[in-house]
C-alpha cells in the first residue's frame, strides 16, 4: 500500500506544482506598460501613480535616494539614450497634447480681413474706395471679358453718368458695364468719381492693381484660417515639460530625473522646503537649475564637512579623529596655514539653533570651487556669539557656554535632530587647549 501511495502523492504534488506554475505564468507579476516594447514608456497617468510633488510624505518604494524621490528613471543609471532619440517622446499626431502647451484653437477671422464673399452684401465697415476696388476685382473675375472692357470702357466714358442713373435701379443685366457702374456708384456726384474712371479706361493698371490685392486678401484669409499650423509641427516635441533638477541629497545622487508634466509640479518651490527643515538631505527638489547645491565631497549620512576643496581629499579616518575632538594637526590642514578659511565657514546655525548640515542648505548657490556664495563672514571669538535680534525673536536661543574649535564644529557627526550647542569658533591658537572629551548636552555622547 505504501509503495502504491507514494507515486500517487508525488503525482498530486506534481499536478499542484504545475497548476501553480500555470497560474504564475497567467498572472502578470510584472505588467507591461502600454507603449513601445523594450522602452521605458510611461504615460502621464502612470507618472501620477508613481508619485508626484503633491504626495511627498509617502515614503516611495521606487527610490533608494531619499524621501520623496519617487520615479528615478533609467536616465540616472545611464541605461537610456537621451530623450530626443526615444520614440515614445516623439510627437504622435492622434495624441491630445496637454492644454497648457498646446496652441490655442484657430482664432476667428478678424473683422477687417474675412473672406471676400460676405464682403459684398454689407459695405458699411469698409472704406468705400477699397470696397469699390475689391468689388470691381471680383466683378471682373466673374465677367472674364478683359478685351471687351478694353474696347467698351473708352466708348462709355462720356455716357457714364447717364448709364449710372439708368442701370443702378435695375438688376444688373449688362455684364460689361457692371464694374464701371459699381465703381462710380458711391462717387457719382463728386468730381473724384469722374476722375477715377478715366485711368480705368485702358483698365490695365486697374486690373493689375486689383488682382494682386484680391489675391493677397485671399492669402491673408487663408493664412488666418490655417493660422497656427506651421508652429503646430514643432510644439509637441516635448509633450510634457522635462524638469531635470540635480539636487544634493543623502547620497548626492541626482534628486529627480524624469518626465514630469506641469500639472504635477503644483507645489513648485514652496512645498519641499518644509521637508528641507525636517530632513537635512532633502534640499533641492525644485523645477530649476539655479538654486541647486552641489556637494564637492560625496557624503554618506548627515556628516558636516568642509566646504573647501581639501575636503574631497581627506580620508574618513581624519574625519573621525576630528569628530572626537582629539588634537590632530593633519585633520585640519586649513586651520594654521590659512586663517582666511574662517571667513569661508558658514555661520548660519547660531548658538542653539536647529541647523541644516553645511552642504545641504537648499537655497544658496555655489561658486565653481564649491564655496557657498551669499553667506556673511564668521564672527570672531571676541564678538557677541548670540544672534541678531530678529533671529532671537523668532527662535529660542541657548547660551554659548564653551568655544568649539573649527574642525570639531565642521566635522562632528550630527544626528538629524541635534545641533552643536556653541557655534562660537575659536581662533587658530586654541588648538593645544582642546579638551579630549566634549561635554555637550546637544550631542549624543559615545559610551
UniProtKB/Swiss-Prot annotation:
Keyword Signal: yes
Signal peptide: 1-26
Tissue-wise expression: Ameloblast-specific. Located at the Tomes processes of secretory ameloblasts and in the sheath space between rod-interrod enamel.
InterPro entries in the cross-refs: Amelin
Residues covered by region (Disordered): 165-211, 307-338, 353-383
Positions bearing Phosphoserine: 43
The keyword Phosphoprotein is annotated on this UniProt entry: yes
Residues with attached carbohydrate: 112
Pfam family, one: Amelin
Gene Ontology process terms (BP): biomineral tissue development; cell adhesion; odontogenesis of dentin-containing tooth; regulation of cell population proliferation
GO cellular component, one term: extracellular region
UniProt GO MF annotations: growth factor activity; structural constituent of tooth enamel
Cellular location(s): Secreted, Extracellular space, Extracellular matrix
Family: Belongs to the ameloblastin family.
Protein name: Ameloblastin
